[in-house]
Amino acid sequence: MIPPEQPQQQLQPPSPAPPNHVVTTIENLPAEGSGGGGSLSASSRAGVRQRIRKVLNREMLISVALGQVLSLLICGIGLTSKYLSEDFHANTPVFQSFLNYILLFLVYTTTLAVRQGEENLLAILRRRWWKYMILGLIDLEANYLVVKAYQYTTLTSIQLLDCFVIPVVILLSWFFLLIRYKAVHFIGIVVCILGMGCMVGADVLVGRHQGAGENKLVGDLLVLGGATLYGISNVWEEYIIRTLSRVEFLGMIGLFGAFFSGIQLAIMEHKELLKVPWDWQIGLLYVGFSACMFGLYSFMPVVIKKTSATSVNLSLLTADLYSLFCGLFLFHYKFSGLYLLSFFTILIGLVLYSSTSTYIAQDPRVYKQFRNPSGPVVDLPTTAQVEPSVTYTSLGQETEEEPHVRVA
């Protein structure tokens, strides 16, 4: 008898042995201490390069560069003021501020005057005139106090105490703008301040720490007062340009700044202005000062909106170094290698600060006083719990998990 066929056994193809694949994979792994470590090292280097490219991205470099443009404008302001006060004995800080406010008035206030609707100058004045009046006074007196301090205290004290604006901006941004910082931001801030301390140390070593110093306590208090007012003005500026517009801020600053500086000029500085030996050189210096000041005021809101008030004030720490580098050729200052160390230390701190975005724990109930009536208004339910939103403020999306925000 013929045995029955077994089709199932014939139809099943031989399955490949799984252990062969596993064995092959294990055999291909580089052994410890062998030449395979080179590939691991190459992958590590590639990972480091990728992280560096992520940190030094285009947006971050643009932000740092914009801050340095502001520093160069402040350098121009300082140089023209130095020539006016030391070479031509024209000590007119209020008049110089008055010229800047007049330019802002002519450009931005007139722009508001010709607008229609809720963005018109009269409509803005009806709703917010007293707030801009206070802001104009703060901005004017911040400039005046710091310039006045040079008559009483030393350059070293002014450079150190002027850094007080940074903690003022951080605290005001935290409580009023609800900006939240990460550890890397505080590390960057500390590095920037260390760079500033290095510059002051270099000034002491080369003998630039001397100053008038007639009444050092009064001068130091003037610097602290001016730095505090600067911080308030910068945070208020960021608040307005993020909720309203840059043109409105500059137009109202020009209006009230010109008004109050004109009054202060007539009361306190008219005699000094009459003593100025007017000629084409002095006129050119006033034009240069006004151009740099107008450029600073016009460009700073753009940089603040792209970054933040804190980032801008950190960037401005290099302004003294630019003035010093120019002074090496113009005023024959002594050079120290610590100046270069200070410059690059501040830049490293800026890179660290800008490498990670800050974020805003934004409660929709916060921005009420400067709300733009022409913009869309969203009615929030009164019975439901208002939940905050988390918005990154500077340099793009973060890959890490968004921090948890709680509203009390």
Swiss-Prot record:
Subcellular localization, as worded in the UniProt entry: Cytoplasmic vesicle, Secretory vesicle, Synaptic vesicle membrane
User: Would you say which domain of life the source belongs to?
Assistant: Eukaryota
* InterPro entries per the UniProt record, alphabetical: SLC35_F1/F2/F6 (IPR009262), SLC35F_Transporter (IPR052221)
GO CC annotation, single:
synaptic vesicle membrane
Q: Does the keyword RNA-binding apply?
A: no
Question: Where do the record's region annotations for Disordered lie?
Answer: 1-21
Q: Where are the transmembrane segments?
A: 60-80, 94-114, 129-147, 158-178, 186-206, 221-241, 247-267, 284-304, 311-331, 335-355
- Gene Ontology MF term list: transmembrane transporter activity
- Keywords noted in UniProt: Cytoplasmic vesicle, Membrane, Synapse, Transmembrane, Transmembrane helix, Transport
Query: What membrane topology term does the record carry?
Result: Multi-pass membrane protein
Please describe what this protein does: Putative solute transporter.
Q: Which family does it belong to?
A: Belongs to the SLC35F solute transporter family.
Q: What is this protein called?
A: Solute carrier family 35 member F1
Q: Which organism is it from?
A: Homo sapiens
| Gene that specifies this protein | SLC35F1
